[in-house]
Amino acid sequence: LDVLRAMHKSPAAVEAFRALREASGGLPAVIHASYLVNLGAEGELWEKSVASLADDLEKAALLGVEYVVVHPGSGRPERVKEGALKALRLAGVRSRPVLLVENTAGGGEKVGARFEELAWLVADTPLQVCLDTCHAYAAGYDVAEVPLGVLDALDRAVGLERVPVVHLNDSVGGLGSR
C-alpha cells in the first residue's frame, strides 16, 4: 500500500490506511521518522532535521498513527531535546502522535546509548522512549542473557511507563560492539 511507504497526504491514501488500521482490530500504529534526521546537528542540518520530523509528525497525525520513532542523532544532547520539542510545536501536536526517542548503539557523538541519557532527554517533556533491543545490545546492555536486568535498568532510569514501544530485533554484532 502506497501510504505505508511514502506517507502520501492524498485523501484516498489516508482513507485506505485508516481502513487497514480498522481491519487490524485497532492495534497501535508506529512509524519511523526519516533516518536522515539529526536532531543533534547544528545550523542548516538541524533546521532541516526539525522540519523533516515536524512533517513526519503531521503525516502521522493525519493518519491517526499513535507513535513516531526518531533516532536522536549525533552532536549535543541539548540540541536533540530542543529539536524534538520544536518539531512537536511546528506540527501542532498536542497529545497524538507521541514522539518516541529511540535508544542508539552509541559510538562517536551519537546521543542516546545510555539509559540515563534517554532519561534526561525525556524528562519534563511529552517525549517518550522506544527501546531497540539490537541497539541496546550493541551499547552493552545484555538483552540476550539478562533481559529482565536490562528492563530493570531502563525502568530505574526512564520508567517503563515512558517506554510504550519495544523494537525487538537481533544483532549480528557482539555485546557492546557499537
Report residues per predicted region:
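Active-site beta-loop-alpha junctions enriched in small/polar residues
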Residues: 1-2, 34-36, 73-75, 102-106, ...
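Gly/Pro-rich active-site loop or hairpin
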Residues: 8, 40, 111-119, 137-178
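Short amphipathic alpha-helices and their capping/turn segments at secondary-structure boundaries
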Residues: 10-25, 54-59, 85-89, 114-124, ...
